[in-house]
Design a protein with these regions (language model features):
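Conserved G1/Walker A P-loop phosphate-binding module
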Residues: 2-116
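Amphipathic alpha-helical interface elements that mediate macromolecular binding in regulatory proteins
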Residues: 27-28, 61-65, 116, 129, ...
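Core residues of folded domains in eukaryotic genome-function proteins
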Residues: 46-49, 83-87, 112-117, 156-160, ...
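Structural signal for hydrophobic/aromatic residues that build the beta-strand cores
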Residues: 50-53, 63, 118-120, 160-163, ...
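Switch II (G3) loop of P-loop NTPases
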Residues: 110-137
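Conserved C-terminal guanine-recognition region of P-loop GTPase G domains, centered on the G4
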Residues: 135-278
């Protein structure tokens, strides 16, 4: 036995082409195998994300830029987004208090810190599929059909900030109908997500903030009127999209689940209110602010509480 071991050691230590080839393979393959093992053994932690959605011209990109830079001046000029643009931001807490976004942006901000991605999505009608695809991705994860992450590394969606121009939401203005139609699609997708889970455990809630922007303008509506106007328009959209369903003479109890799933909010209700979305574990808040004047602290607090 000892003789065989001695011969093996002598062969290994004797320079030869075979020894050089084996040694080279070991040097090349071992680091690769170790890297693959460590990569598979260590789960990749994607940052939680907040989506910025809403009609074009509402101020989504300006809001994202303001929160990213944390400046005290006027909001910088921006251009219409063509693709989703994520930026990494930090929520800082000093004890139980959430620091304002200007302080959170500092490298030396006190307290604990948590990073997240704020994803600006295009508001143009032909490009809204980017936002809806991300919401659909959240639905797929809730139902267990998908384990993929977005291409930019964004993790689970924790909230949706729907930015609207508060000066373009008069009852007779076309801007109200356009904003409400987009919001209807967003809320409908989230409502369907609530029932998409395969298990008895409900998916994590995704709440919505309607950020009524441009309150610095004289013609801007206060948050309370933005809320009531949107609720009324959403009710009209719901009625038109479900036309004939309630007038068919069929009782509510006789309506199939598929038809009820296509009804936003409380089924059969005459008026729509955001409060009806609580049935699906969706809170909808309407808060006013102004990106131009930097008055976005209430929006920042809302975002920070979801991270």
């Amino acid at each position: 036995m000892m003789e065989q071991l001695k011969d093996a050691l002598e062969y290994i230590l004797t320079p030869s082409p075979a020894v050089f080839i084996v040694g080279g393979l070991i040097v090349l393959l071992v680091p690769i195998l170790v890297h693959i093992f460590v990569e598979r053994a260590t789960p990749y932690t994607a940052l939680p994300s907040i989506l910025l959605v809403g009609p074009a011209g509402g101020g989504k990109t300006s809001l994202q830029t303001l929160l990213e830079r944390g400046g005290d001046g006027h909001a910088p000029a921006t251009h219409t987004s063509q693709t989703p643009q994520p930026v990494e931001l930090t929520v800082s807490r000093d004890g139980m208090s959430i620091l304002p976004f200007r302080e959170s942006a500092r490298d030396d901000a006190p307290g604990s810190h948590k990073k997240f991605l704020l994803v600006d999505t295009p508001g143009h009608g032909k490009l809204r599929n980017h936002a809806m695809d991300r919401i659909a991705g959240a639905i797929s994860k809730a139902s267990g059909n998908s384990k993929k992450q977005s291409s930019d590394g964004a993790g689970p969606v924790r909230g949706i900030v729907f930015v609207v121009d508060a000066a373009a939401l008069d009852d007779g203005d076309g801007g109200l109908a356009a904003a409400a139609a987009y919001l209807y699609d967003v809320l409908m997708a989230l409502q369907r997500r609530a029932g998409a889970g395969r298990t008895s455990r409900a998916p994590s809630a995704i709440h919505v903030l309607v950020a009524a922007n441009k309150l610095d303008l004289f013609t801007a509506l206060p948050a309370s009127l933005v809320r009531s106007n949107l609720e009324a328009e959403l009710g009209r959209i719901r009625q038109s999209r479900s036309k004939g369903l309630l007038d068919s003479g069929v009782g509510i109890d006789d309506i199939g689940s598929e038809e009820q799933d296509a009804w936003l909010g409380q089924y059969g209700s005459d008026k729509f209110t955001f409060g009806q979305m609580r049935e699906f574990d969706i809170e909808v808040d309407v808060i006013g602010g102004s990106v131009l004047e930097g008055k976005v602290d209430k929006w920042w607090d809302w975002i920070a509480k979801r991270i």
